[in-house]
A protein has these predicted regions:
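Conserved SAM-binding loop
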Residues: 82
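Conserved alpha-helix/loop element of class I SAM-dependent methyltransferases that forms part
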Residues: 11, 21-44
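Conserved SAM/SAH-binding beta-strand->alpha-helix loop
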Residues: 75-76
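Conserved SAM-binding strand-loop segment of SAM-dependent methyltransferases
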Residues: 90-101
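A short acidic, Gly/Pro-enriched loop at the edge of an enzyme's catalytic core
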Residues: 105-114
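Conserved class I S-adenosyl-L-methionine
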Residues: 42-52
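N-terminal, positively charged/glycine-rich alpha-helical extensions of SAM-dependent methyltransferases
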Residues: 1-24
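Conserved SAM-binding loop of SAM-dependent methyltransferases across substrates and taxa
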Residues: 53-66
Length: 123
């Protein structure tokens, strides 16, 4: 990816807000409606691709303290803003990573729920 394109993510930040339709409670309910047996929301591992500053992910982490949340975003600026909020809120169950999703490392592990709302909204 070009440096110019990378810089644009910091120049024009995505407005990061909660999107309740992506909460694991909602996703699990939809899974039940389709005959699935979704993983427990209370202890789930949740990944948000394109998390920006964590505006969607942090409220989830606050409401589900025994779950684990990982957010990835291309913008180091937004990820750092989100990390500041994580520290201010004292959330121990959130990890925000600045990275290109095409370079997603296997060591981040498997996830029970994956959200990519911001990616589709921004594109």
């Amino acid at each position: 990816m070009s440096n110019e394109l990378l810089a644009s993510y910091d120049t024009f930040p995505y407005q990061s807000h909660p999107f309740r339709q992506s909460h694991p409670d909602r996703l699990a309910t939809i899974g039940h409606l389709f005959g699935m047996t979704p993983p427990s929301v209370e202890t789930a591992r949740v990944l948000e691709i394109g998390c920006a500053a964590g505006g969607n992910l942090l409220p989830m982490a606050e409401s589900l303290p025994n779950a684990e949340f990982v957010g990835v975003d291309l913008s180091p600026r937004q990820v750092e803003e989100g990390r500041d909020d994580v520290r201010k809120l004292g959330l121990a169950n959130v990890r925000l990573v600045a990275m290109d999703i095409t370079d997603f490392p296997a060591d981040l592990g498997a996830f029970d729920y994956i959200v990519a709302h911001g990616v589709y909204s921004w594109v």
